[in-house]
Amino acid sequence: MVVRPYNDELRYLEKVSDHCWRIKKGFQPNMNVEGCFYVNSRLERLMLEELKNSCRPGAVGGFLPGVKQIANVAALPGIVGRSIGLPDIHSGYGFAIGNMAAFDMNDPLSVVSPGGVGFDINCGVRLLRTNLYEKDVQPVKEQLAQSLFDHIPVGVGSKGIIPMNARDLEEALEMGMDWSLREGYVWAEDKEHCEEYGRMLNADPAKVSMRAKKRGLPQLGTLGAGNHYAEIQVVDEIYDKWSASKMGIEEKGQVVVMIHSGSRGFGHQVATDALVQMEKAMKRDKIETNDRQLACARINSVEGQDYLKAMAAAANFAWVNRSSMTFLTRQAFAKMFNTTPDDLDMHVIYDVSHNIAKVENHMVDGKERKLLVHRKGSTRAFPPHHPLIPVDYQLTGQPVLVGGTMGTCSYVLTGTEQGMQETFGSTCHGAGRALSRAKSRRNLDYKDVLDKLDQLGIAIRVASPKLVMEEAPESYKDVTDVVDTCHAAGISKKCIKMRPIAVIKG
């Protein structure tokens, strides 16, 4: 790797608009396409500082700076369009988190890279609405937080309480939310409001290792640790009244529940297993990449297909997982308010994934092409009238759920036609880290973080308080900056803003 002085690096970066920078070819070796990243002035400073720090002599660190990672992805075989960094981008394994890239399915050299999906396959967000208002929940929020904490298993080693044996797991991996529906954990209409209807049809549990299944079996219906949470939120601001009403959000003060979780240790194992296989495939097929972490395989190779089938099974696991937590959340609310989930109108507004690779059709250079779209820390955001979004949202565009961090706001956005053209129908997924986990632990004290939430009037239940500072708002970029940048750039549109009143965390 060549270390160039910072000013030389800057020659390859060009600001093309208030919210978008271009990364020219040559910034990293063998780039097949250009890169770009979306930022506002504050986020831009973070991106460039990260690059500047990596140019210092003797700068050794964990991951490469995000800008470099975007450019390395642009050098992968078969990539089309541009390698795109969204405003919440931060460096990660192989691909930066907040990087999306699309590969031409008809190009025999095109690759699939597990680093472009991430270890927590189908980590995603689900939003439930209620007909309760802040005034109904405020007096009982502590009990409600406790009740959710008791109902939903949380934390690193948490085990599920949804009864599950090995055969059930096989079926759940293949069927996704259809399994949850059959077992009575979700309502039929929940599926309609899920990306992929909660089931990837190419899932093949036979492509998943025993070890992954062993890790996954006890964890179904659990929240996990890290940035995963269940939050009781209040609608704070409505930017697009008409679209919000189509989602069942009529006015400020309405209570919603957001669940953010993924495929737990199961997805992690699937990714780990695939990386081992792909290293072999790269040697055999002589695939060169700029970064070892970008291990990949030709989409049409046995390894590529096996990974996509196992990844789909992990995605199904995550949908079943969020569905099980939906069930537990509905139970907790119904018990608290002495009624039924139905009477509380606890419908799923939408469920989106932000770590996944999917086959989609997009326009490239004026022609429609079949692409494998990698989204890592990036959310699908299809425009109005797109055939893959549910009937209820045909006129609004697909809802996009953007989770904030503990104690900060979350947003619902909608997809736009411009996003379809510029970013393959993708937008941001959250706040994006500004400090690494290790730095957060060194710089922040968990007691201060919890006190601050208390002062904000947020009830909190945490399984592992020592991990709290990793997730403190100070560790992240400002989610409002991120969402506003996407809105201003036109790749998604702001619809609703929510603020938390209770947080349940791993």
UniProtKB/Swiss-Prot annotation:
EC numbers on record: 6.5.1.8
Enzyme class: ligase
Cofactor detail note: Binds 2 manganese ions per subunit.
Keyword vocabulary terms for this entry: GTP-binding, Ligase, Manganese, Metal-binding, Nucleotide-binding, tRNA processing
GO biological process, one term: positive regulation of tRNA processing
Entries under HAMAP family matching the protein: RtcB_euk
Record protein name field: RNA-splicing ligase RtcB homolog
Gene designation per UniProt: RtcB
